């Protein structure tokens, strides 16, 4: 459960000049996390939701950003002690932070009058992503006195929450050597 307030930017991003400036941004969020152990197996899961409200009182192209709602989740099942007493293997499914509902209202210049006054028109821009990124991956980790190893092999659909018809594979390998 949390609340953040920022008087000079929106979600850590500041703007000035013709875009306008956020006078206040408030983000509230709640999350649930679970851990269940069953002998050599365990499962972890979490779910987070939140909402951001912002106020634009300055003159600029951004008239306002309506309340934004976002979510993320993950679930994993792991087995410990596969090859050594300090390793684990698991399968994970997760969704990175995603904006569930977001829109921005813009006040854009579209022309001038004969008296050289600028004409503005309001536009509403839907910022809600077209897709939902889901990652599914196999993970393995081990630690010894001299090194740590972590690897994952996975598939991602709708990467960056952009609707696609393809599923992309990925691989990551981290090796740390202890020099002590």
What are these regions (language model features)?
Residues 77, 88, 166-180:
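Outer-membrane beta-barrel "beta-signal"
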Residues 1-24, 29-37, 44-157, 161-165:
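Outer membrane beta-barrel transmembrane domains
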């Amino acid at each position: 459960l949390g609340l953040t307030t920022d008087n000079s930017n929106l979600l850590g991003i500041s703007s000035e000049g013709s875009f306008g400036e956020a006078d206040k941004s408030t983000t509230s969020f709640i999350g649930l996390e679970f851990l269940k152990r069953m002998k050599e197996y365990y499962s972890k899961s979490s779910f987070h939701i939140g909402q951001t409200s912002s106020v634009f009182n300055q003159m600029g192209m951004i008239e306002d950003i309506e309340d934004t709602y976002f979510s993320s989740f993950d679930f994993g099942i792991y087995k410990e002690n596969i090859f050594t007493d300090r390793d684990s293997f698991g399968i994970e499914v997760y969704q990175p932070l995603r904006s569930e509902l977001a829109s921005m209202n813009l006040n854009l210049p579209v022309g001038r009058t004969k008296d050289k006054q600028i004409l503005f028109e309001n536009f509403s821009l839907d910022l809600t992503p077209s897709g939902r990124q889901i990652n599914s991956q196999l993970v393995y980790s081990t630690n010894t006195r001299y090194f740590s190893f972590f690897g994952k092999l996975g598939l991602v659909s709708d990467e960056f929450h952009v609707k696609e018809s393809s599923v992309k594979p990925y691989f990551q390998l981290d090796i740390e050597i202890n020099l002590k």
